[in-house]
Amino acid sequence: MRVLGIDPGLRRTGFGVIDAEGMRLRYVASGTIVVPPALALPERLKVILDNLREVARETRPDVAALEIVFLNTNPASTLLLGQARGAALCALADSALDVHEYTALQIKKAVVGTGRAAKEQVQMMVQRLLSLDGTPAPDSADALACAICHAHVGPLHDKLDRLGTAAQLGSRPRLRNGRLVG
């Protein structure tokens, strides 16, 4: 499974692509889309949209993972970040990719083992898990961490979704209150 991870931002949007076979991970590509701050908001969003479309076209991922926007103390910043995230979602939808979303806490827990990990810890674990020669840039590391999180957690979620669908169709096994019942 090839996973495209995205760390959305209006100034800098990180992307990272990995291949995952079971628990084995392989680095494919990563980078940061730097958006010129002098551009008007619509043009800034278009830069994100166009660049992520190009990344998806070139790397041909099977699925995408995106970090969920956190609530900031500054509502205006949260709205702007949400718009950058919207541009990323449009690029992924345009590329016909299934999108899975994870909180920063979920991503850090999946990659480092604790949801309270510092950025440097995430960078170090991404470097180790993907056997990279150097430490990835912060935005790229966050995007790669998002992809790694999906590689570890996504298949389990898919199985649970299928079990839930089977329960709705009346076959066994079934889920009740989030628990498997037989």
Curated annotation (Swiss-Prot):
Localization per record: Cytoplasm
Keyword Glycosyltransferase: no
Cofactors required: Mg(2+)
Top-level class of the enzyme under EC nomenclature: hydrolase
Keyword DNA repair: yes
Catalytic residues, chain numbering: D7, E67, D139
EC number(s) recorded for this UniProt protein: 3.1.21.10
Positions with a binding annotation for Mg(2+) 2: E67
Classification via InterPro entries: RNaseH-like_sf (IPR012337), RNaseH_sf (IPR036397), X-over_junc_endoDNase_Mg_BS (IPR020563), X-over_junc_endoDNase_RuvC (IPR002176)
Biological processes, Gene Ontology terms: DNA recombination; DNA repair
Reactions mediated catalytically: Endonucleolytic cleavage at a junction such as a reciprocal single-stranded crossover between two homologous DNA duplexes (Holliday junction)
UniProt binding sites for Mg(2+) 1: D7, D139
GO molecular function: crossover junction DNA endonuclease activity; DNA binding; magnesium ion binding
Superkingdom of origin organism: Bacteria
Cofactor annotation comment: Binds 2 Mg(2+) ion per subunit.
Alphabetic keyword roster: Cytoplasm, DNA damage, DNA recombination, DNA repair, DNA-binding, Endonuclease, Hydrolase, Magnesium, Metal-binding, Nuclease
GO cellular component term of the entry, any: Holliday junction resolvase complex
Annotated function: The RuvA-RuvB-RuvC complex processes Holliday junction (HJ) DNA during genetic recombination and DNA repair. Endonuclease that resolves HJ intermediates. Cleaves cruciform DNA by making single-stranded nicks across the HJ at symmetrical positions within the homologous arms, yielding a 5'-phosphate and a 3'-hydroxyl group; requires a central core of homology in the junction. The consensus cleavage sequence is 5'-(A/T)TT(C/G)-3'. Cleavage occurs on the 3'-side of the TT dinucleotide at the point of strand exchange.
Subunit details: Homodimer which binds Holliday junction (HJ) DNA. The HJ becomes 2-fold symmetrical on binding to RuvC with unstacked arms; it has a different conformation from HJ DNA in complex with RuvA. In the full resolvosome a probable DNA-RuvA(4)-RuvB(12)-RuvC(2) complex forms which resolves the HJ.
Name the record gives this protein: Crossover junction endodeoxyribonuclease RuvC
Gene for this chain: ruvC
